[in-house]
């Protein structure tokens, strides 16, 4: 193991947006086959890590409804210990800003930031591909955050091709409803046979903001009226408004932060509105190669 710090503070766990999300089939084990473009944005949770000389894994922050042992950050650390035999432990504090059940990948991003940070803190120097393989055991979105850059994703979300996206700012609205992902994917009305997309469908990358649709959106709008209302409101300012992931957050792209912020400032008070800039890379991407 290489020399390593004993503490890493202010580690971002950025959100993602699904610029489109197509359900193209289903595996025999029930997992849905997807195609999507993942866009990183600068709205994030923040994690702090302090190395322990023992093997204990301690979440020092209470999170309502999420027992520490079930938290993806602890599960990620546990898997990393098991994979490497590392004898260190860690204290993890989380500043939670991303809404749970929002379709922003908050829990998955927290897990990926944990894998990346502990790779450095514990002096493991594991390659990115190995961290992505570990991350897949935690959830289909985790490998993307470890991958560390905007991507066209296939399979259950783990087959990733880097993609260059145009600069953009986004208005993201959380309608303050929690959407359990299984409730959307198990709905009989879900479209599961959207034709396959190939990455060369985006010769002009600007088209990606208007491309396709979110196949989960119609089901989510039917089940959760507040999502539908947020989309109607946002479409006053952009015809490109759509939902991310399985909801509940909706978003629209704008040419610059000033325009996006002006719209975000008008979001009705019963919802949470946010202006977020697009990122090209994960802030901790350098923690693995």
UniProtKB/Swiss-Prot annotation:
GO-annotated molecular function: 4-(cytidine 5'-diphospho)-2-C-methyl-D-erythritol kinase activity; ATP binding
Pfam families: GHMP_kinases_C, GHMP_kinases_N
Source taxon at top rank: Bacteria
Catalytic machinery residues: 16, 141
Pathway membership, UniProt: Isoprenoid biosynthesis; isopentenyl diphosphate biosynthesis via DXP pathway; isopentenyl diphosphate from 1-deoxy-D-xylulose 5-phosphate: step 3/6
GO biological process: isopentenyl diphosphate biosynthetic process, methylerythritol 4-phosphate pathway; terpenoid biosynthetic process
Claim: DNA repair is one of the keywords in the record: no
Residues where ATP binds: 99-109
UniProt entry keywords in alphabetical sequence: ATP-binding, Isoprene biosynthesis, Kinase, Nucleotide-binding, Transferase
Primary enzyme class: transferase
Family under the similarity heading: Belongs to the GHMP kinase family. IspE subfamily.
Protein name per the record: 4-diphosphocytidyl-2-C-methyl-D-erythritol kinase
Natural source organism: Ralstonia pickettii (strain 12J)
């Amino acid at each position: 193991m290489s020399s390593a710090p004993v503490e890493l503070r202010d580690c971002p766990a950025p959100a993602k947006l699904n610029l489109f999300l197509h359900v193209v089939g289903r595996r025999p084990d029930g997992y849905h086959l997807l195609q999507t473009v993942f866009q990183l944005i600068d709205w994030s949770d923040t994690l702090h890590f302090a190395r322990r000389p023992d093997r204990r894994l301690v979440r020092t922050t209470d999170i309502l409804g999420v027992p520490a042992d079930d938290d993806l950050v602890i599960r990620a650390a546990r898997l990393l210990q098991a994979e490497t035999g590392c004898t260190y432990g860690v204290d993890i504090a989380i500043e939670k800003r991303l809404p749970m059940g929002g379709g922003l990948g908050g829990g998955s991003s927290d897990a990926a930031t944990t894998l990346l940070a502990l790779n450095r803190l514990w002096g493991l120097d594991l390659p990115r591909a190995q961290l992505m393989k570990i991350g897949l055991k935690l959830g289909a979105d985790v490998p993307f955050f470890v991958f560390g850059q905007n991507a066209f994703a296939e399979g259950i979300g783990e087959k990733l091709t880097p993609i260059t996206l145009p600069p953009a700012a986004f208005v993201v609205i959380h309608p303050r409803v929690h959407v359990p992902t299984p409730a959307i994917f198990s709905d009989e009305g879900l479209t599961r046979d959207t034709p396959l997309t190939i990455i060369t469908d985006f010769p002009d990358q600007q088209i990606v903001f208007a491309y396709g649709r979110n196949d989960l959106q119609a089901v989510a709008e039917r089940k959760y009226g507040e999502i539908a209302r947020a989309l109607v409101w946002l479409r006053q300012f952009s015809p490109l408004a759509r939902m991310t992931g399985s909801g509940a957050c909706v978003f629209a792209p704008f040419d610059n932060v000033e325009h996006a912020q002006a719209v975000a400032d008008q979001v009705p008070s019963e919802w949470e509105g946010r202006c977020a800039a697009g990122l090209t890379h994960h802030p901790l991407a350098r923690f693995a190669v």
